Structure formats: C-alpha cells, structure tokens
A protein has these predicted regions:
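Extracellular glycan-recognition regions
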Residues: 1-177
C-alpha cells in the first residue's frame, strides 16, 4: 500500500490497531466521532485519523475500505484533518440492517456540512478517490475500484498550503472496544 510508505502518523491512535504492508485494521472505540456544531449543537473531535502530510497542490489518493459495522453510526472512510475546526471526512455510516449512509462532511471554521445518500447495508466495502486542486477538493466513490462517481466538490478555507489526509474509523455509540 503506497500510503503506508509515506510515513503516516496518528491523530488520536486507537487502542487496538493492526498494520501490515497492505492494510490497516482499526477496532473502533465507543464514543469516537468527528462532528462540529451544525444542526445538532454539539462538537465531537476524538476519532482516530491515520494520515500523511503533503504540500502537493495536485494529487489523487485512492483507497479501499472494508468494514464490519454493527452499531448505529459506525463509520469507516477517508479524512483530511487539519485541526478541530477545519477537516473533511467521507465514509459509509451504518444506520440499521437495511440502510447505511454514504456521505461526506466538510467542516470549515468550526461548522460541519453533511451530505448523504442512502445505500444498502449489504455493502461492506467502498473505494474512495480524494483529489486536490489547490484549496479545492473532490471526493468520489466506487464499489469496484474502477468506475468512480462524484460525491462532492468542495473548498477548504484553511486547505491551501500543507495538508494532512488519510483514513479514519469511529463509533459514536457502542464500538468494538
């Protein structure tokens, strides 16, 4: 996995994680999440994020996530975490045995903006392509790693220079540990 060759670092390392040359396995901890203020009024900033640093202005990062969600709101996906008030995440968020939400959250200056679409809970893996063009970004998803579809194009007010991006997983309710 090319990502692991770039010396990724943890923001809030999980208690249980396994890393080998081609995958990272995270056992999520209960009560972990990323969300900032909008609509619900609370802020959660304690999810583990495993990411690399870059000043490259033009790139794409492609990663496949596989997950075993069991509790409402379990999440696994990609993230760009700059600080607690400026970050992005895209993932599948488990809802129930029938549906889950494929979505993205953009947080600029401390306020989150969430966009979702419902998908089947039978889907247990997803590819993501995260692309940067200066301080503008695009997130795409794919079930087969070949045919990507756009989820969102967005701007990060604090994302013009050095950024950090990678993968994350969290469990706002129960978790595995």
């Amino acid at each position: 996995m090319e990502f692991l060759k770039n010396n990724p670092k943890w923001i809030r390392q999980p208690k249980q994680v396994q890393i080998n040359e081609d995958k990272v396995v995270i056992l999520t901890e209960r009560g972990t999440d990323l969300w900032a203020r909008t609509y619900y009024g609370f802020q959660n900033d304690n999810a583990p994020v495993f990411q690399v640093e870059t000043t490259d202005k033009y790139f794409s990062f492609i990663v496949k996530t596989e997950f075993e969600s069991t509790c409402r709101f379990d999440q696994c996906g990609v993230a760009m975490y700059l600080n607690s008030d400026n970050w992005f995440k895209a993932s599948i968020e488990y809802e129930n045995e029938k549906i889950q939400r494929l979505g993205s959250v953009v947080t600029n200056h401390g306020y989150s903006d969430w966009a979702t679409t419902d998908i089947s809970s039978d889907i247990k893996s997803m590819w993501y392509r995260f692309s940067r063009r200066d301080s503008d970004y695009c997130i795409e998803c794919s079930e087969d790693g070949i045919n990507f579809r756009q989820m969102r194009i967005f701007h990060m007010w604090e994302g013009a220079e050095k950024i950090t991006y990678g993968i994350y997983a969290c469990s706002p309710t129960e978790g595995f540990i």
